[in-house]
């Protein structure tokens, strides 16, 4: 791999002076930062405004017709001056140098257009040498983040909310890693509670050892459904201690008291379920560092939490239950029960205990909970309680929320498990692929490709809009190769691969030393400008925690590549021109590959 100073060493090769480096900028790995530094430095000389105020005021444009960066003059807060007049004066005086093609005033804005020739000489070699590392940047030093995501309940369906948490959390974990954080991926399972008493009693009645080993998640769910049916049918006709409910309570009590025999069965259920989850998550390119769960929160931590609540004067009793009145700190937060009248703790207390345990163990710099927006109140109460307990690290907790998925069900009915969704997507994708007989005949492992493309369909549909928005799960739209879908991204990647294969006589070593000044067409210039944006897209995504930032960028990129095919031919050109164009396509494929991997997809080579 080339050194990360590649961009700056390239500047030296071109005998171009490097602009002064602004705070929090990374010009060695981000061309847009290099441009920001140049613009800030030069605009400061013209305007007399400090460059440290100009740098953060530079914004992305919403269309490339408005340039690559713009500055709204009102953001500089210059008293007594007309922003439109200043924009005109400063734009006229601005030196384009090697960096810019033109500078234009547009109302109270100045628009800066990067020089595509200059960009090509820096960006294309940078992408081709850094490969998978292009886009990554060490934004922080020695910082640790825990990301808790997915968190299904054992023996209950893995519903749409878990799917969204898994996809968004997987993306965030990859993003934080790319930008220099040490990431701990954590799955906090619903693996404790009275339902395990029910499961144990149910397993004695309806369990099957072979079925448990073969498919623990479905089998335990079937047992759970049947035992709940028994409870329903019994009603109040049997004395509590003889009833199914009574036996389940008694069993869970044994678990809570540490009875080895009771815990042995529970451990088997938990371990088998985790093994099955590991396989399913692997299909989404997710590997957890820690499988935690409600069961892992020690009794000591919860008792310590309740003692601390009392010590800080946060609690009061009501009919034997212990409550915390949070309205004193924020009227919207209401009152939270932390201990029931029978002395048992609630989910909230368990979460507080878990957070305390985690800080003790990992000393994280940040902890992110990827949980549905229905839990907004719960998360806000939980964070406020930790803050009022006096924990300095409470400010480092963040809730990344998301909306609902509507209409997710399979052919066989409405109870949905993640592996059912993935299997059905694979089958449907396979059916779609078979319709094109010629292409289908060329695919070496069609089922494997159908699986990867199908998974892309599910994931892109989920990440396409802002995460807070609800969306409808639509098979037809999702599996289409037309429009902005996962299969379209896969198709775009495989087509770029085929361009490379068809010109295999021109080696990748030649690409880096190509004459990029031959890339003169407007379509090529636009593509080069887009490729330079990728590192900045990642930095923007970490501010908003929005996967759609990356998804939208990848669709822009693939649409532009598609426009290039009509005008930038490789076949039948002189070797010099073919090499330059091939280098551009190779760089575009690398950036598309990097973006797809970041989102959790596996790009396919042929389809």
Swiss-Prot record:
Function comment: Forms part of a macromolecular complex that catalyzes the attachment of specific amino acids to cognate tRNAs during protein synthesis.
Motif ('HIGH' region): 151-162
Coiled-coil portions: none
GO biological process: arginyl-tRNA aminoacylation; mitochondrial translation
GO cellular component: cytosol; mitochondrion
Record's subunit section: Monomer.
N-acetylalanine: residues carrying this PTM: 2
Organism per entry: Saccharomyces cerevisiae (strain ATCC 204508 / S288c) (Baker's yeast)
Sites bearing Phosphoserine, chain numbering: 15
CDD domains xrefs: Anticodon_Ia_Arg, ArgRS_core
Gene3D superfamilies found in the cross-reference section: Arginyl tRNA synthetase N-terminal domain, HUPs, Isoleucyl-tRNA Synthetase, Domain 1
EC number from the UniProt entry: 6.1.1.19
Protein name listed in UniProt: Arginine--tRNA ligase, cytoplasmic
Annotated compartments: Cytoplasm; Cytoplasm, Cytosol
Membership in a protein family: Belongs to the class-I aminoacyl-tRNA synthetase family.
One Pfam family cited in the UniProt record for this chain: DALR_1
């Amino acid at each position: 791999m080339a050194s990360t100073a590649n961009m700056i060493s390239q500047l030296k090769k071109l005998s171009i002076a490097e602009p002064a480096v602004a705070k929090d900028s990374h010009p060695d790995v981000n061309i847009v930062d290099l441009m920001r530094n140049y613009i800030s430095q030069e605009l400061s000389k013209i305007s007399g405004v400090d460059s440290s105020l100009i740098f953060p005021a530079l914004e992305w444009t919403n269309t490339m017709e408005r340039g690559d960066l713009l500055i709204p003059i009102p953001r500089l807060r210059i008293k007594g001056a007309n922003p439109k007049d200043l924009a005109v004066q400063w734009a006229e005086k601005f030196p384009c140098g090697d960096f810019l093609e033109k500078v234009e005033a547009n109302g109270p804005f100045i628009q800066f257009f990067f020089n595509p020739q200059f960009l090509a000489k820096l960006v294309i070699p940078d992408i081709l040498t850094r490969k998978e590392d292009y886009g990554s940047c060490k934004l922080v030093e020695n910082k640790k983040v825990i990301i808790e995501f997915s968190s299904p309940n054992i023996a209950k369906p893995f519903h749409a909310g878990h799917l969204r948490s898994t996809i968004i959390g997987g993306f965030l974990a990859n993003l934080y890693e790319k930008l220099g954080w040490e990431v701990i991926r954590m799955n906090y399972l619903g693996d404790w509670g009275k339902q395990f008493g029910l499961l144990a009693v149910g397993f004695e009645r309806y369990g099957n050892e072979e079925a448990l080993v073969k498919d623990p998640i479905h089998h335990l769910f079937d047992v759970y459904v049947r035992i709940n049916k028994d409870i329903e049918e019994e009603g109040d006709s049997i004395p509590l201690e003889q009833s199914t409910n009574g036996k389940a309570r008694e069993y869970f009590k044994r678990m809570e008291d540490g009875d080895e025999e009771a815990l042995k069965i529970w451990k088997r259920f938990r371990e088998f379920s985790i093994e099955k989850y590991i396989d399913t998550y692997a299909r989404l390119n997710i590997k957890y560092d820690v499988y935690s769960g409600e069961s892992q929160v020690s009794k000591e931590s919860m008792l310590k939490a309740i003692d601390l609540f009392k010590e800080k004067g946060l609690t009061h009793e009501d009919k034997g239950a212990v409550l915390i009145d949070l309205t004193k700190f924020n009227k919207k937060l209401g009152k939270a029960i932390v201990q029931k009248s029978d002395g048992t703790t609630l989910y909230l207390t368990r979460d507080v205990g878990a957070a305390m345990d985690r800080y003790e163990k990992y000393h994280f710099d940040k902890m992110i909970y990827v949980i549905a927006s229905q839990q907004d109140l719960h998360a806000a109460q939980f964070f406020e309680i930790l803050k009022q307990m006096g924990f300095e690290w409470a400010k480092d907790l963040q809730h990344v929320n998301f909306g609902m998925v509507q209409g997710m069900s399979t052919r066989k009915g409405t109870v949905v498990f993640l592996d059912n969704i993935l299997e059905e997507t694979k089958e449907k994708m396979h059916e779609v692929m078979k319709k094109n007989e010629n292409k289908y005949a060329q695919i070496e492992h069609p089922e494997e490709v159908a699986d990867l493309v199908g998974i892309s369909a599910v994931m892109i549909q989920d990440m396409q809009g802002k995460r807070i928005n609800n969306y409808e799960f639509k098979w037809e739209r999702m599996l289409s190769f037309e429009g902005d879908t996962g299969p379209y991204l896969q198709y775009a990647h495989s087509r770029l691969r085929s361009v490379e294969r068809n010109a295999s006589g021109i080696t990748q070593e030649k690409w880096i030393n190509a004459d990029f000044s031959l890339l003169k067409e407007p379509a090529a210039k636009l593509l080069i400008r887009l490729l330079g944006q990728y590192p900045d897209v990642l930095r923007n995504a970490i501010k908003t925690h929005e996967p759609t930032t990356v998804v939208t960028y990848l669709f822009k990129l693939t649409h532009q590549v598609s426009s290039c095919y009509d005008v930038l031919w490789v076949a039948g050109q002189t070797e010099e021109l073919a090499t330059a164009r091939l280098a551009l396509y190779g760089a575009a494929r690398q950036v598309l590959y990097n973006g797809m991997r970041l989102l959790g997809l596996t790009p396919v080579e042929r389809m």
